[in-house]
Swiss-Prot record:
This is Sucrose transport protein SUT3. It comes from the Eukaryota. The gene is SUT3. The keyword Cell membrane applies. Residues 1-20, 76-94, 157-171, 242-275, 349-355, 426-441, 492-506 are cytoplasmic. Pathway: Glycan biosynthesis; sucrose metabolism. InterPro entries: MFS_trans_sf. Responsible for the transport of sucrose into the cell, with the concomitant uptake of protons (symport system). May also transport other glucosides.
Length: 506
């Protein structure tokens, strides 16, 4: 049942209020979101296709993404809890942001140089231009870096969102939401631009080695740029996010007798704000509808739209890589729409209500995922509906590819809703309790990572039943989106217009 609520923003009730920050200062304080999102964009656009070139079959690539939900289930709630109670002189959030960003830099270097690491550990000595077989040492190094990247991403995300809610002050969390989404969009634009660029190996030819050819060198260079950008954005956030440290004595008294670690997380889940359980249910269904596309969008472009294969003939590999680059370009267009749309979310919520905006975005995703399935069937229709058969014929030009890119653009607005409204509603509910943004953001993340775990375990085998394509997962995503829209109508709290502009966090 929907709950009507009138909520006010405010601090988290733990320690002194942070000093007032200017709008430009708030903009710079959120810059770390752009740096993290740059690496995340590269991860989403390039790594699922790339791991297949190292010998991991398509059916198992989704299992690799299990690290995300596991990290989110364990790391982010605990980090959120500890950041609420942290008494460091740097403040509550910045120590976790700094630590996580350092680990992100290490992990992306491991990923970028995984082929060279595998070569040093005993992979095939043939030149990568002629060798098409598996490279298991490289795959192991890649997966290690991939998992480390997901754990470090989760270390940063919760505190970064909570920091934004802490600092929003007189500007209101909706303004902070728009700034945060803008940085996310900029990070996405830069990351997807890097991923769609095929000239990195020409600009930095020294990155090519016997184990690392053009596609690998492009990946390596893009991740090295990610390290530089993340380092810069982290430094700016550390300087401009002026937190007030908690008093250790007062914090110790407040925390006396409280459970710690995962026990405190589960205890917190038992005492959620009114309306929060409904938000968790709808969030879970919403993310079930998004994850197949998030995980397989560029692979879908390479296979179903461009009819390529990562482990096929040279012509098929070339077609697959071109599809992946076009998929990254589609994600770039999606991010531009995301950045523009982030400034439309607040007025839409004021006019229609957060619940209506959330429900309508789920309905749009339902239509879009159905369209992805239909477009894929159209592209493969002349080849018996099988990726293997389609890969033996020239990729279809014209309408199919243009329509595929149009779908990326079409999904920009609902993705902006996904990136802001659930977190804003969560922070609004938390504000009514007077604090605990870090913990509640971590609990919300559980409703995101559990669906991802289900998709990671089930999508690959499910698609394998239908010829190693992505159509079945996208069709199921359409069903989940319809369920999310229906659940949103029935369950989501009805938040007043005033509270949308006065409380929230991303």
């Amino acid at each position: 049942m929907a709950v009507d609520m009138e909520l006010d923003g405010g601090g988290d009730g733990k320690g002194k209020a942070p000093p007032q920050i200017s709008l430009s200062g708030l903009f710079l304080a959120c810059m770390v979101a752009g740096g993290v999102q740059y690496g995340w964009a590269l991860q989403l656009s390039l790594l699922t296709p790339y791991i297949q070139t190292l010998g991991i079959p398509h059916a198992l690539t989704s299992v690799m993404w299990l690290c995300g939900p596991i990290a989110g289930l364990i790391v982010q709630p605990c980090v959120g809890l500890y950041s609420d109670k942290c008494t460091s002189s740097l403040g509550r959030r910045r120590p976790f942001i700094l630590t996580g960003c350092i680990i992100i830099c290490i992990s992306v270097i491991v990923i970028g140089f995984s082929s060279d690491i595998g070569y040093a550990l005993g992979d095939a000595t043939e030149d990568c231009k002629v060798y098409r077989g598996p490279r298991y040492h490289a795959a192991a190094a890649f997966i290690l870096g991939f998992w480390l990247l997901d754990f470090s991403n989760n270390t940063v995300q919760g505190p970064a969102r909570a920091l934004m809610a802490d600092l929003s002050g007189r500007h209101g969390p909706s303004a902070a939401n728009a700034i945060f989404c803008s940085w996310m969009a900029l990070g996405n634009i830069l990351g997807y631009s890097s991923g769609s660029t095929n000239d990195w190996h020409k600009w930095f030819p020294f990155l090519m080695t016997r184990a690392c050819c053009e596609a690998c060198a492009n990946l390596k260079a893009a991740f090295l740029v990610a390290v530089v950008f993340l380092g810069l954005s982290t430094a700016v956030t550390m300087v401009f996010a002026r937190e007030v440290a908690l008093d250790p004595v007062a914090a110790a008294k407040r925390n006396e007798g409280e459970a710690s670690g995962p026990l405190a997380v589960f205890k917190g889940m038992k005492n959620l704000p009114v309306g929060m359980p409904s938000v968790l249910i709808v969030t879970g269904l919403t993310w079930l509808s998004w994850f197949p596309f998030i995980l397989f969008d560029t692979d879908w472009m390479g296979r179903e739209i461009y009819h390529g294969r990562p482990d096929g003939s040279p012509a098929e590999v070339t077609a697959f890589q071109e599809g992946v680059r076009q998929g990254a370009f589609g994600l770039l267009l999606n991010s531009i729409v995301l950045g523009i749309s982030s400034f439309l979310i607040e007025p839409m919520c004021r006019r229609l209500g957060a619940r209506a905006v959330w429900v309508m975005s789920s309905a749009v995703v339902c239509v879009a995922m159905a369209a992805v399935s239909v477009l894929s069937a159209w592209s493969l229709g002349d080849f018996g509906g099988s990726v293997q058969d389609a890969a033996r014929a020239p990729a279809e030009e014209g309408g199919v590819r243009a329509s595929a890119l149009a779908l990326f653009v079409f999904l920009g607005l609902p993705f902006a809703v996904l990136c802001s409204v659930p977190f804003a509603v969560t922070a609004q509910l938390t504000a009514s309790r007077g604090g605990g943004q870090g913990l509640c953001t971590g609990v919300l993340n559980i409703s995101i990572v559990v669906p991802q775990m289900a998709i990671a375990l089930g999508a690959g085998p499910w698609d394998e039943l239908f010829g190693e394509g992505n159509i079945p997962a996208f069709a199921m995503a359409s069903v989940f989106a319809a369920a999310a829209a229906a659940a949103g109508v029935v369950l989501l709290p009805k938040v007043s217009v005033r509270s949308v502009s006065m409380a929230g966090g991303h």
